[in-house]
Amino acid sequence: MYKLLLSMLLVSLSTASVKADALHRNPYQPANSANMQTFGSTSIPIGAYEYCKRYAKRCQYETKASGIQLTRNVWEKIVDVNVSVNSIIRPMTDMEIYGIEERWELPADMGDCEDYVLAKKLELSRFGIPPGALRVTVVYDANDGGHAVLTLVTDRGDFILDNNNNRVLRWQEAELTYVKRQKPGNLLHWESLRPNS
């Protein structure tokens, strides 16, 4: 019994430590909120802008739902898509693939972080998750490098799908600094995840 209590305490402390680290990176986000707070409109990333110029129909879509109800079936599909896309796509930079610094593209078998996000977004929308619940999100990773993840907006909070992690995490648990994300239903319009940016 003592070992069980001790292990439960250690898990609790490690989870609290991870949350504290993530929240330390995002002091303007409310610690107890299940969803990230937004701070108004902001600029579109150049990669998203150029992607939308090439594929206009992929960037604007009708969406009534800006979030989803998180059921066991939906959760299992989300985890499955995150793991399968992470394992199928080989990580390579845009410079290695296209010879340019930044290009967002649906990947065939290789890509960088934005490409993983676009692939996950496509797979989850095919499953029936409304596009408004799937938000491309620009962040800084644990090493302060520019990065992109997919945020899933649900009735139980915002969850992060990251090509660097097979686990789907609550936004507070991911060791990321949140910068901005697309608005529901339109990859051309973005909202800030921190004030004055």
Label for each model-derived stretch:
Residues M8-L10, D109:
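N-terminal hydrophobic alpha-helix used for membrane targeting or insertion
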Residues L10-V18:
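Hydrophobic h-region of N-terminal signal peptides that target proteins for export
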Residues K19-S197:
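A structural boundary/capping signal
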Residues M1-S7:
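Sec-dependent signal peptide recognition
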